[in-house]
Amino acid sequence: MDFGIGFISTNIMLPILDFFFGIVHSYGFAIIALTLVIRLGLYPLSAGQIRNMRKMRITQPLMKERQEEIQKRYKDDPAKQQEEMAKVMKEFGNPLAGCLPLLLQMPILFALFATLRGSPFSDINYTVDLQILPQEQVERIVPQTFSTKPQNIYVDEALHYPIAVFLPGGKMLGVGEKTQLEIQSTEGKAFNQVIPEKNSQILTPTYSVTKGEDRISVNPDGTIEALVPGDATVQVTIPGIAARTGFLFIKALGQVGVTGENGEINWDILGMIVFFGFSIYLNQELSGASGGGAPNAQAQQQQTINKITPILFSGMFLFFPLPAGVLMYIVMANVFQTIQTLILMREPLPENLQKLLDEQQKATQGRESLPFEKKSSKKKEKTS
């Protein structure tokens, strides 16, 4: 049994999504509600990560100074050097400790991402690989039923089934032989039997040959005819019932890419990508990722990286496009993260950290700026 991302998606994400859809009767609002519930549930973990990051940013200069001092003092005694380094880590904390909350969140966030990339927000594809053999070879092979991995398919609002594609005679066909692709639930019901009549046209499967077009032919009803020996691949596509549903300024939740088939710009998707990049930049500014400690060349370099990062992450969606519904989730999650960061960065620091921060700021104010430093780098961090 699958207890990974698929299990979380099927047994946690989809029931929550169905619950909210039953209340608001809008897949767009259901996505927002699902995102907020998951982010609120993960709040303690992400809050711990932000607090640890804030602490390490303040203590890093002193920690680095101690480590360099230990390396010089015990350069001829590796065992003693390691012992003293361990004491420093115990005093200041391990910088990698902030990664643990992130790692604990990843399976849930990936499951949420996978849920929104599936039905009903996107078309679902099944791949069937076939091997066409000469008739005399097929006669010596015992047929074995083939089935694809089941996927959750929404056949109506808040109604879904695990659906798979079957080949009763197996994947090996003889030249001139015909077979029928059968779409069924895991309980053995034909796909057209579980679809409400009102959605029969919307959910009509389509069949296409993605490899070996000269070796097989596929009819609109899923009948395959083997033509010549070789390998071939058939793709079965079941439409998502909400893929073409709009929400607020979004034309279709399943729409993919900044440009459409005719080259027109999808301004709704482009707007979300730009806002996503802006939210990353704002989050970095709020978390003080470009500040802390005494300004130096390394801090200046970090400022440049923080300006480039939003552009890189936003540009990624131009080359790896996602459905509009998934982009909306990512934007909402980033907005939540930004608000969370704003709240946590205003928390009063512990007395020892506040004292250390005050000393760093006094040292920064007490020296002249170097030519490559900007005046903005001397701004104080707000602690309340």
From Swiss-Prot:
Q: Which UniProt keywords apply?
A: Cell inner membrane, Cell membrane, Chaperone, Membrane, Protein transport, Transmembrane, Transmembrane helix, Transport
Q: How does it sit in the membrane?
A: Multi-pass membrane protein
Q: Which GO terms describe its cellular component?
A: plasma membrane
GO function term, MF aspect, one: membrane insertase activity
**Known partners and oligomeric status:** Specifically interacts with transmembrane segments of nascent integral membrane proteins during membrane integration. Interacts with the precursor of PSII reaction center D1. Coimmunoprecipitates with CyanoP (tlr2075), FtsH2, FtsH3, Phb1 (slr1106), Ycf39 and Ycf48.
By sequence similarity, the record places it as follows:
Belongs to the OXA1/ALB3/YidC family. Type 1 subfamily.
| UniProt protein name | Membrane protein insertase YidC
The species is Synechocystis sp. (strain ATCC 27184 / PCC 6803 / Kazusa)
